[in-house]
Every structure is written in structure tokens, then in C-alpha cells.
Swiss-Prot record:
Gene Ontology biological-process entries: translational termination
Localization per Swiss-Prot or TrEMBL: Cytoplasm
UniProt cross-references to InterPro entries, sorted A to Z: Ribosome_recyc_fac, Ribosome_recyc_fac_dom, RRF_sf
Taxonomic placement: Bacteria, Bacillati, Bacillota, Bacilli, Bacillales
SUPFAM superfamilies for the chain: Ribosome recycling factor, RRF
Role of this protein: Responsible for the release of ribosomes from messenger RNA at the termination of protein biosynthesis. May increase the efficiency of translation by recycling ribosomes from one round of translation to another.
Name this protein carries in UniProt: Ribosome-recycling factor
Pfam family, one: RRF
Taxonomic source organism: Macrococcus caseolyticus (strain JCSC5402)
Amino acid sequence: MTTEIMNELKSKMEKSIESLQRDFAAIRAGHANANLLDRVSVVYYGAETPVQQLAGISVPEPRMLLVTPYDKTSIDDILKAINMANLGVNPTSDGNVIRITVPALTEERRKELVKEAKKEAENSKIAIRNIRRDANDALKKAEKAGDITEDDLKSFSDDVQAETDKFIKKIDELTASKEKDILEV
């Protein structure tokens, strides 16, 4: 019972960290990165489709992305979706490929991005704390049901807190790394 609770706790916390890493990857740090287009979806034959499924994305230069559609007829739809995604980039098309020039970030924009990264990190910390609360509630129910003793409850609650602290520390490390990446000129 308690092993299941701890395994579920770790699994959910790891998923929360993975989600944060995906969110951080989508925050552009002033250099071209294929992850910049992760959240861009294109309406293609009536269905929302991620741009990665419609085109090859490469980084030929530090400040340029090259989007090569597999189906040339989708190029206008992809261009429109990139423009509507409000990524702060200027895509241009020559009919065969889309070139996205990633402009250098201003100091003000860098600070906004750091603030956004910190907000994402705080949301992840809240998720981790909610997972901790759920695990502690499950342990208390197990104790009331007589599945574990009061001493076991204390011991497992300490384990839950140790896991929580470990994942919060990981979030802080990821945030510091992303902040450094964003502020690097």
C-alpha cells in the first residue's frame, strides 16, 4: 500500500518536472531552437496538427530556423500558424521553405522571459506540493483504516517530504539554468 503511494508520488512528480522542462524549452532564449515551434499547431485538412508532423525543422545558423514542409501545399497554413503563435519571430517563405529569423532579445524582453520562466517554475512547485498533499492524505486514510501504524505514518510522511524537497530543489536548479540561458547575451 505505502509502496504504491510512494511510487505514484515519484511518478507524478517526475511528470511535473518533465512538463516544466517542455515549458522551458518553449521559452526562447535568443538563439534558434527547434523547440520554439513545439506549441505551434496548424489547421491541416480540418484538423489541428503540430508543425513537427507537417515539416522538417532544422537550425542551419545560430539565429535561424528552416522549416521544410513535407507537402508544399501546406506552406501557407504553416506560415499563418507561426505568425499567429506570437513567438516574436519573422517567418518568410520562398514557396519551398520557411525561414525564421530569431531576433536578438532586448534587455526588457529577457526580463519578461525570466519572469515567465519563474511563473512556470512556481506553477510546477504548486503541482509538486499538491501531489505531496494527496500522498499525505492517502497515508492518513491508510492509518485510519488500520493498514499502517502511527509510527509508520510519521516515517512515510517524512519520506514524502524528502521526495518533495528533492523535486523542489530540481525545479530551482532548472529555473536557475534557464534564467542564466535567457540572460546570456
